[in-house]
């Protein structure tokens, strides 16, 4: 009887179940979207029960459509939208409030207060993160402060907190396992990434009782088993957990120090494996835990670009320049260059290395000769420039020179963008055969824990390249274009 690993990929807009075989190939997948709630401007929430329902639905659909029996599942891996916070009652399993999503800015005031009190350096030192509404800690504080009776219940030990991975493991195990992994814990603002413990000083600042917090475990081990009534009478090991970006790094087999991947989704997330060293950043990067495996912890540097794929959506929906995102490649290729046009897509501010949330988008160098093609090309090129900004920060912080960049996410299908990316970085850009690297990473972590795959060496050998893009542009020309981008950034920041 052939066995499989089931990967549950719980994202920001949808939940997916993907079956992988021993070769790391996708056998079948199912997807279900769920509701986004925007109670006030800048707030984003999800219904945690609806997310749980969507997970049960995609598991059932995936197995039945693939004609795979529950007993053929050797293990379950979970990867998740990071930072999103859920607080629920231990006794009933009912959330006391909606899940507050990573994008939500509703705790911005709490963050400002913490910064004013001078906690920034201490938080940075312990967690590798910035004080920002993006991370989970202030979201938990907000729920305890704003939901009637929540703080009292928490003090009495009646409430539990978890990021989405924790919530799903708790539900799947019938409330037996309240755990998270190192990669997710490192995004909460409450976890000390050096001594690998929840930090009492941080919890005190955020006024979060320790009794609410899950146990932190490696990213690849058996955390518990599914209860039979949630998994068709089977007790399947839940054996791998990692946050989405770290799972993608693992799925791309970036196991050695200095290897990096960039995911081109709504935004871009670039992670570089820094080995067993937590590299502190002086250039606006986050220091984070990549994964815990075989008794060791691997760290990573992370850069966040807020607008990537969403800039192409803007060309389609806002500017009506293309009918489909895929057309952008064809339009961009019709012209030799942008003819001096730069688009800075700072629609929601700028991420790494600038961290400026006040700045807004701008266009430079427009003349009477500027056409739609120039504009589309300049928008695509902005993704390449922003990635170079992040890479420069990574090389400066780590002292590691990037040899190749592995890429994944929706926009990597765009050959023009991938070629420009290689030209801008002056290193090869490698696109894998399997673009579902996030789900694959979670599957690999689970499979290693249950012996489905023997070792990371076996996984590394499975990584298969679709295409490598190598630099075709002269280095001098690349530098010239990039210095124009830096000027455009400075001018954009000056306009407020």
UniProtKB/Swiss-Prot annotation:
Residues annotated as carrying Phosphohistidine in the record are 230
Which residues hold glycerol?
A: 82-83, 134, 244-245
Which SUPFAM superfamilies does its entry note?
Actin-like ATPase domain
Any Gene Ontology biological process? glycerol catabolic process
- Enumerate the Gene3D superfamilies for this protein: 3.30.420.40
Activity regulation (record text): Activated by phosphorylation and inhibited by fructose 1,6-bisphosphate (FBP).
Q: Name one Pfam family in it.
A: FGGY_N
Q: Which annotated residues bind ADP?
A: 12, 16, 266, 309, 410, 414
Which positions are annotated as binding ATP? Answer: 12-14, 266, 309, 313, 410
Catalyzes what?
glycerol + ATP = sn-glycerol 3-phosphate + ADP + H(+)
Listed binding positions for sn-glycerol 3-phosphate are 12, 82-83, 134, 244
Q: Name one GO molecular function term.
A: glycerol kinase activity
Task: Kindly provide the PTM information from the record.
Answer: The phosphoenolpyruvate-dependent sugar phosphotransferase system (PTS), including enzyme I, and histidine-containing protein (HPr) are required for the phosphorylation, which leads to the activation of the enzyme.
Which Enzyme Commission number(s) are on file for it? Answer: 2.7.1.30
Q: Which GO terms describe its cellular component?
A: cytosol
Q: What class of enzyme is it?
A: transferase
Assembly notes: Homotetramer and homodimer (in equilibrium).
State the function annotated in the UniProt record: Key enzyme in the regulation of glycerol uptake and metabolism. Catalyzes the phosphorylation of glycerol to yield sn-glycerol 3-phosphate.
UniProt cross-references to HAMAP family, sorted A to Z: Glycerol_kin
User: What name does UniProt use for this protein?
Assistant: Glycerol kinase
What is the organism of origin for this protein?
A: Bacillus cytotoxicus (strain DSM 22905 / CIP 110041 / 391-98 / NVH 391-98)
């Amino acid at each position: 009887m052939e066995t499989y690993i089931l990967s549950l990929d719980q994202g920001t807009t949808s939940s997916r179940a993907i079956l992988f075989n021993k070769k790391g190939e996708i056998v079948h997948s199912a997807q279900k979207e769920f509701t986004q709630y925007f109670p006030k401007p800048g707030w984003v929430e999800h219904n945690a029960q609806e997310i749980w329902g969507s997970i049960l639905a995609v598991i059932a659909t995936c197995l039945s459509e693939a004609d795979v029996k529950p007993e053929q599942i050797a293990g379950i891996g979970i990867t998740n939208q990071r930072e999103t916070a859920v607080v629920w009652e231990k006794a009933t399993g009912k959330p006391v409030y909606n899940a507050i999503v990573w994008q939500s800015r509703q705790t911005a005031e709490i963050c400002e207060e913490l910064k004013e009190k001078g906690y920034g350096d201490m938080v940075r030192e312990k967690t590798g993160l910035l004080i920002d509404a993006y991370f989970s800690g202030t979201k938990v504080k907000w729920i305890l402060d704003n939901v009637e009776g929540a703080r009292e219940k928490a003090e009495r030990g009646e409430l539990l907190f978890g990021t989405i991975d924790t919530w799903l493991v708790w539900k799947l195990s019938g409330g037996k396992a309240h755990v998270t992994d190192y990669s997710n814990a490192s995004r909460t603002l409450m976890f000390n990434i050096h001594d690998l413990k929840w930090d009492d000083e941080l919890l005190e600042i955020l006024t979060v009782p320790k009794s609410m917090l899950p146990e932190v475990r490696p990213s690849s081990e058996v955390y518990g088993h599914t209860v039979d009534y949630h998994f068709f009478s089977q007790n399947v090991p839940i054996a791998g957990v990692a946050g989405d970006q770290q799972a993608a790094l693992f799925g791309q087999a970036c196991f050695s120090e200095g290897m990096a991947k960039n995911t081109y989704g709504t935004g871009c997330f670039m992670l570089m494996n820094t080995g067993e060293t937590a590299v502190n950043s002086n250039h606006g990067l986050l220091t984070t835990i990549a994964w815990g495996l075989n008794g060791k912890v691997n760290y990573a540097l992370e850069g966040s670009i807020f607008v990537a794929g969403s800039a192409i959506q803007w060309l389609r929906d806002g500017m009506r320049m293309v009918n489909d995102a895929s057309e952008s490649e064809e339009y961009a290729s019709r012209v030799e260059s942008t003819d001096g046009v730069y688009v800075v897509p700072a629609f929601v501010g700028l991420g790494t290395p600038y961290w400026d949330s006040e700045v807004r988008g701008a266009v430079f160098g427009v003349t009477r000769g500027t056409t739609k093609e120039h504009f589309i090309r300049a928008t695509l090129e902005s993704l390449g420039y922003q990635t170079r900004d992040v890479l420069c920060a990574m090389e400066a912080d780590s002292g590691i020179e990037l040899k190749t960049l592995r890429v994944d996410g929706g926009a990597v299908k765009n050959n023009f963008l991938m070629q420009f990316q290689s030209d801008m970085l002056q290193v090869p850009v490698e696109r894998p055969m399997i673009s579902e690297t996030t789900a694959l990473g979670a599957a690999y972590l689970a499979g290693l824990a249950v012996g489905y795959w023997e070792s990371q060496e076996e996984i590394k050998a499975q990584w298969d390249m679709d295409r490598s893009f190598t630099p075709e542009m002269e280095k001098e020309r690349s530098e010239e274009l990039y210095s124009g981008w830096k000027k455009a950034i400075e001018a954009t920041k000056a306009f407020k």
